[in-house]
Amino acid sequence: MDQFQSMGISKTILPVLFITLITSGCGSDVPPGEIEGAPRSSDSIYEQDLRFLETQSNLFETQESKSQILFGDLHVHTTYSIDAFTLELPMMGLQGVHDSAMACDFARYCANLDFFSFNDHAESLTPDHWREQKEIVQQCNISNDDPVTNDLVVFPGWEWTQIGTTPENHWGHRNVIFKDIQDLPARPIGSRAPKTGLGIFDTTQKAVAARWLDPLNFKRYSDLGWLLDTVRNIPFCDEGINSNDLPLDCYEYARTPQDLFSKLDEWQSDSIVIPHGQTWGFHVPLGTSWDNRLNDQGHDPSKQILLEVMSGHGNSEEFRDIAAANFLQSGEMSCPEPTNDFLPCCWQAGEIQKKRCEGLSDAECTARVELAKKYTLAGGPYTNMVFPEAAPEEWLNCDQCTDCFKPAFNYRPKQSAQYALAISNFDSGENNPQRYNFGFIASTDDHTARPGTGYKQYERRKMTFAMGPKSQMWEYQYKAEDPNFPELPKIEPGESQPDSERVSSFVYPGGILAVHSEGRSKDQIWSALKNKNVYGTSGPRILLWFDLINAPEGNAPMGSEITMSQNPKFIVRAAGSFKQKDGCPIESIDSLSPKRLEYLCAGECYNPSDQRYIIEQIEIIKITPQSYAGEAISPLIQDAWKTISCKGQSECIVEFEDSNYSRDSVYYVRAIQELTPAINGMNVLSEKQEFKLCKGSFRTDLADNCFGETNERAWSSPIYINKP
């Protein structure tokens, strides 16, 4: 009662209020919404393409390029995802519903994208939501009348969200996208198996109880309860039955990637599977690496052809020879000592314990320090639960990559793209190694139905994954049994609270994907994706071409796989992204209602000027994959192998040759743009700076964008060259 009075609710109106809650506060479904904006006009798209062609002609001069570069996002969540629903509850201080229809309007008129996909978590998609989202995809794909200036292509899909408790049973997250809604699987296929409850989404059940503290928003919390109950009550499909023969309204699951690939084969649908967020240690067990998936159980080279190297959760490209734990031959872990570049969380747990040793004997303090280290190693990604009442600042910069560009939180280096390209599986003999030959992309992993948020750096709480309650009233405090004694975290997904305060310093507006496509049609974009003629950027629309110019059959673009004996020669062409004007273009203002425009775009849209940012340099990375079992990884990754200045130009052309080509080699390039302000752009964890976290909760000013200067960039897909 006192809680309600503190909110300004008097005793006299409480009975009326509760009657209202009982009669109208029951939870219900959230509809898919209605698309408001019409397709973009042919004239506006034609004008946009002319600007691209002008830059392209400058870079190619006498040589003609038959492709155009289109931009998209293949990682988008809506309110149909349980975590997305929870993060937008009133207690979080954000907006609320972000339905599937909003994604179409945002993509067209806020982000000005050419294509995107829906990727709600399969583990929380109900049968009705799956059917409704297919209808939205169909509606959103209705374009203008001219196929040459087709304005937007939308691909259906879902996210397979698997989290393990050990390196051996952790497979990670994968987006599954499809070309068409025809022949689409009848059900999304998730990873949640019987006896696991809702898995990682079990922690959201606590949020439903907040309706009693926020009676004016009672219905919204009840809607979350409805969604959780509905998902929980969907019957599991029987195992061992062909997907085509299962009932429409059961929940289908795949325990491993191999199971997922097999089920996709049963549907015979054209699909692409995209691993993502691999280095993001928010849920990933210590010691996890690409090694346990480079086999038929974890990889299908015909489907798993693209890798997301950048998202709103950070950069997953770079390998570093750092370790949060040492693995002994016995299988046990030990805590490594810190270095100048890396602070293991297990070590910092010991330092935190030392500050809680007042009144203890030296022997007892030492024992507790060692126990804190042991529990931190056992807790894996749930480090924060060893001392649940400790301030997040006490953990300092532990387990973070301190010199990576926009690093993912709790960085797992053996999950990086570079590590993946360096390893080989020799189970079939040294002359027939199995390797990853990914194309590189970037996307957002946005959870507010906002595809392509990286066009501008603004509104940190709306355009990134920053999370946290809006005031102390909503802050959930985990009580320690003894604040001065370490606790052993539970590691089953959904049983422990992740480190949501520290992670908010490692969230970004997200990346964007570019395709070299022969046109704007769905078939042409899909063909570019399948051919891996793609690249990713950290958000800005940098233009990038990377070609092998002396391949046996002529030029070979990024994503190619070539066998050749002569030294390879390459050419790189790049142009900086357009500097942005404030606000939104007239077309966006005229196409959406003021309310819709403000709700989705928050006052800013993709609105390019005529000026481009400078490309400072081109960095070439060379990786020579393992040629025998046990070959050390670090020497195989040369980052950067070459760095070539662009001499202060916004358009840059460089050529280079590898005169030391002597074994199978992988090459890709980074185009590095001039310094610009970015959300969480400065590595706040550097020892040279005052340590300060950028929190998603009220503990950092919600209007603070935590700007820091950084060099935005683009990553080409690799060119894979095998020595005969």
Language model features: what each stretch is:
Residues 1-9:
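N-terminal secretory signal peptides that target proteins for export/translocation
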Residues 9-16:
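Sec-dependent signal peptide recognition
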Residues 23-25:
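C-terminal motif of bacterial Sec signal peptides marking the signal peptidase cleavage site
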Residues 27-91, 117-130, 134-135, 229-251, ...:
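C-terminal functional module detector
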Residues 101, 105-108, 112, 189, ...:
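Short, intrinsically disordered, low-complexity segments enriched in Ser/Thr and Pro
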Residues 134-280, 305-308, 312:
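Extended substrate/RNA-proximal surfaces in nucleic-acid metabolism proteins
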